């Protein structure tokens, strides 16, 4: 488990203050290092993108793309908006099932080894034993 450092607690408190708007306060914006710190806190180990990832086969003549700076620095944004820029979770690697594996190199029993040697016949050595 990771210990929570005082800087993480500060960023948590900061994010909560910035991202929760009260009736008297105007909308808040996140810019520069504050925006990066908020994204690191929200996304954690997944990482984040400054622009939303595009799908395959996207046209080079598309409309100009807005990024996190446009949405959270020039305008205000909420926690859900920040989460949209987090990298997707990588699927956990599952342990392979033992039953699903084919066992072709299974050790042979003594009887199988004896029968195999007996079927070879004598190769000039009458006293051949295993």
From Swiss-Prot:
Region (D): 88-95
GO molecular function annotations of the record: growth factor activity; hormone activity; insulin-like growth factor receptor binding
Main location: secreted
Domain of life: Eukaryota
Subcellular location: Secreted
PANTHER family: INSULIN-LIKE GROWTH FACTOR I (PTHR46845:SF1)
Pfam family of the protein (one): Insulin
Function: The insulin-like growth factors, isolated from plasma, are structurally and functionally related to insulin but have a much higher growth-promoting activity. May be a physiological regulator of [1-14C]-2-deoxy-D-glucose (2DG) transport and glycogen synthesis in osteoblasts. Stimulates glucose transport in bone-derived osteoblastic (PyMS) cells and is effective at much lower concentrations than insulin, not only regarding glycogen and DNA synthesis but also with regard to enhancing glucose uptake. May play a role in synapse maturation.
Region C, annotated ranges: 55-66
Disulfide bonds: 31-73, 43-86, 72-77
Basic and acidic residues: bias regions: 102-115
Region of interest (B), ranges: 26-54
Residues covered by region (A): 67-87
Recorded family membership: Belongs to the insulin family.
Protein's name according to its UniProt entry: Insulin-like growth factor 1
Subunit structure: Forms a ternary complex with IGFR1 and ITGAV:ITGB3. Forms a ternary complex with IGFR1 and ITGA6:ITGB4. Forms a ternary complex with IGFBP3 and ALS.
Source species: Cavia porcellus (Guinea pig)
Location of region: Disordered: 97-130
Secreted listed as a keyword: yes
Keywords noted in UniProt: Disulfide bond, Growth factor, Secreted, Signal
Ranges annotated as biased composition (Polar residues): 119-130
GO cellular component: alphav-beta3 integrin-IGF-1-IGF1R complex; exocytic vesicle; extracellular space
GO biological process terms on file: cell population proliferation; insulin-like growth factor receptor signaling pathway; negative regulation of apoptotic process; negative regulation of release of cytochrome c from mitochondria; negative regulation of smooth muscle cell apoptotic process; positive regulation of cell population proliferation; positive regulation of D-glucose import; positive regulation of glycogen biosynthetic process
Residue numbers covered by the propeptide annotation in the UniProt entry: 96-130
Signal peptide, first to last residue: 1-25
């Amino acid at each position: 488990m990771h210990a929570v450092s005082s800087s993480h607690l500060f960023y948590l408190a900061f994010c909560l203050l910035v991202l929760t708007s009260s009736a008297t306060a105007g909308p808040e914006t996140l810019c520069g290092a504050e925006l990066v710190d908020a994204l690191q806190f929200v996304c954690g180990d997944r990482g984040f993108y400054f622009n939303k990832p595009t799908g395959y086969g996207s046209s080079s003549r598309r409309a100009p793309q807005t990024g996190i700076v446009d949405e959270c620095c020039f305008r205000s944004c909420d926690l859900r908006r920040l989460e949209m820029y987090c990298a997707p979770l990588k699927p956990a690697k599952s342990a392979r099932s033992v039953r699903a594996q084919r066992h072709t190199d299974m050790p042979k029993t003594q009887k199988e080894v004896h029968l195999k040697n007996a079927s070879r016949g004598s190769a000039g050595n009458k006293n051949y034993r295993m």
